[in-house]
């Protein structure tokens, strides 16, 4: 993918500016962590970024964006709806095809939810729903991944599994994270947001938890 250049992005709610102006460059091959306290503007920045690159991005929103009445398989399959003709998508809705089952099942196996393949999302726990949303983005195979707290409902080992899969599947990503240790381990650049502004932007190798904690 080409580099993404964001210039003077702003956002306002209720007449009050909550983000920006922010300028940010995202280079191919970068794994960027957005860090900062809740309400700092991370989700708003991700949403604005998605508006700029939606044609080449996979998104894991904080609210997950799953269809509760559909199965895990169908929610994951939705990651590639645009890649297939409508008749084929309808066919998969009625009776999942072998090709897609053979692609999606191993992905769910690695995420620890292959036994939920045909279960409706509404029957899942919060962590299982989160992994379903991540599986959908991984299956999409876009140029860039944007994820808003994709491991917030997962315990330590599972969080590492998911972050490892994300790093493996996507060469370029921007991920909002609360967990500083995960940000330092799986991302090579840290962008800290405070009060709607970029307060920190540096390579992970030059940072320690003590450099990031003041943002919280």
Describe each model-derived feature in a short phrase.
Residues 197-216:
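Conserved beta-strand-loop-alpha-helix hinge in the C-terminal portion
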Residues 145-148:
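Catalytic Walker B motif of ABC-type/P-loop ATPase nucleotide-binding domains
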Residues 120-124, 128:
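Conserved ABC ATPase signature
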Residues 4, 19-21:
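Conserved structural motif at the start of ABC-family nucleotide-binding domains
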Residues 177-178:
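H-loop/switch region of ABC-family ATPase nucleotide-binding domains
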Residues 89-116:
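Conserved ABC ATPase "signature" region
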Residues 134:
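Hydrophobic anchor residue at the start of the ABC signature
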């Amino acid at each position: 993918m080409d580099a993404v250049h964001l210039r003077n992005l702003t956002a306002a709610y209720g007449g009050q500016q909550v983000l920006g102006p922010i300028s940010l460059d995202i280079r191919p091959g970068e794994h960027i962590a957005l860090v900062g306290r809740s309400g700092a503007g991370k989700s708003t920045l991700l949403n604005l970024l998605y508006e700029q690159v939606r044609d080449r991005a996979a998104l894991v929103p904080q609210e997950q964006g799953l269809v509760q009445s559909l199965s895990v398989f169908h929610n994951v399959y939705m990651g590639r709806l645009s890649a297939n003709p409508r008749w084929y998508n309808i066919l998969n809705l009625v009776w999942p095809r072998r090709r897609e089952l053979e692609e999606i099942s191993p992905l769910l196996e690695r995420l620890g939810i292959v036994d939920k393949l045909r279960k409706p999302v509404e029957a899942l726990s919060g962590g299982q729903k989160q992994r379903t949303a991540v599986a959908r983005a991984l299956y999409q195979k876009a140029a860039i991944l944007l994820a808003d707290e994709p491991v917030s409902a997962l315990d330590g080992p599972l969080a590492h599994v998911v972050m490892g899969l994300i790093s493996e599947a996507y060469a370029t990503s921007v991920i909002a994270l609360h967990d500083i240790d995960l940000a330092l381990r799986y991302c090579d650049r840290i962008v800290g947001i405070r009060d709607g502004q970029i307060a920190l932007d540096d390579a992970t190798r030059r940072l320690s938890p003590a450099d990031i904690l003041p943002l919280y």
